[in-house]
Amino acid sequence: MSNLKAIRDRIQSVKNTKKITEAMRLVASAKVRRAQEQVLATRPFADRLAGVLYGLQGRLQFEDVECPLLQQREVKKVGLVVLAGNRGLCGAYNSNIIKRAEARAAELKAEGLEYSYLLVGRKAIQHFTRRDAPISQCRDNPEKTPDPQEVSSATDEILAWFESGAVDRVELIYTKFVSLISSRPVTQTLLPLDLQGLEAQDDEVFRLTSKGGKFDVTREKVSVEPEALAQDMIFEQDPVEILNALLPLFLTNQLLRAWQESTASELAARMTAMSNASDNASDLVKTLTLSYNKARQASITQELLEVVAGA
């Protein structure tokens, strides 16, 4: 009987755990939708900003533009901005981004370049701190989806890092959101910016939809058309000053988009992990129930045999 009670308690424990994992899955799926809505809400400003910037680029393409954020230096030290999460229970999300950062650091070391980390997220901070890695700055990753104010603060730190000469190039390592079951760590150069390649960059917007009763993700390419600036347009300020004011905004937008993708990737990974955990819990309950029924049947049979033998 004690064995039957142990199995019954185990079944109840697994059922309670399944309730928790199912709740976490639903919360993560709702937050993924919120992340999508935030991407779409920031899209109009990003499109107009990029359009004006591209228009200025065309206006200044034959001029010698002096802008600190465009200045190409001899690279001796590289700053690596790593976007990770604060919590676990999200599959291999954090370990994949950490492996990518370590692999990039190994590549830079092989090239004879120094490097330093700017870490976002407690998981990355804990990992690299334990290994005495060269860390310049650390930031907590907000539990909610990133807002422009939070990202603007991070951009200011990155700009100060670059403009002070502490690093000669800044690279961003984040997780690109591909689908609800797939994401991949990528590396993107943040600074210095290269105006010659900006007009060729296409953006992407992801949308969370329902398909066949399940969540699905669609992505669409967004090409930004340059803002038409008349050649005889007279600026109240020097166009170079306008460019210097717009580039930090453009950098903030780039960082915001990457941060939103990383957040969506983490939430999707957590949703998948909790869905798998719920499925495993259901399978375990079935197995335990079968074991319970067999043990109960064996117990009843044993009692009958004892009664018959006693008679």
Swiss-Prot record:
GO cellular component, one term: proton-transporting ATP synthase complex
Keywords: ATP synthesis, CF(1), Disulfide bond, Hydrogen ion transport, Ion transport, Membrane, Thylakoid, Transport
Activity regulation comment: Thiol-modulation by raising the activation threshold of the enzyme upon oxidation of the cysteines, thereby preventing wasteful ATP-hydrolysis.
Disulfide bond sites: 67-138
Subcellular locations according to the entry: Cellular thylakoid membrane
Subcellular location, principal: membrane
CDD domains in the record: F1-ATPase_gamma (cd12151)
Signal sequence region: none
Keyword Cytoplasm: no
Domain of life of the source: Bacteria
Gene Ontology molecular function terms on file: ATP binding; proton-transporting ATP synthase activity, rotational mechanism
Mode of membrane association: Peripheral membrane protein
Function: Produces ATP from ADP in the presence of a proton gradient across the membrane. The gamma chain is believed to be important in regulating ATPase activity and the flow of protons through the CF(0) complex.
Assembly with partners or alone: F-type ATPases have 2 components, CF(1) - the catalytic core - and CF(0) - the membrane proton channel. CF(1) has five subunits: alpha(3), beta(3), gamma(1), delta(1), epsilon(1). CF(0) has three main subunits: a, b and c.
Family membership: Belongs to the ATPase gamma chain family.
Stated name of the protein: ATP synthase gamma chain
Gene from which this protein is expressed: atpG
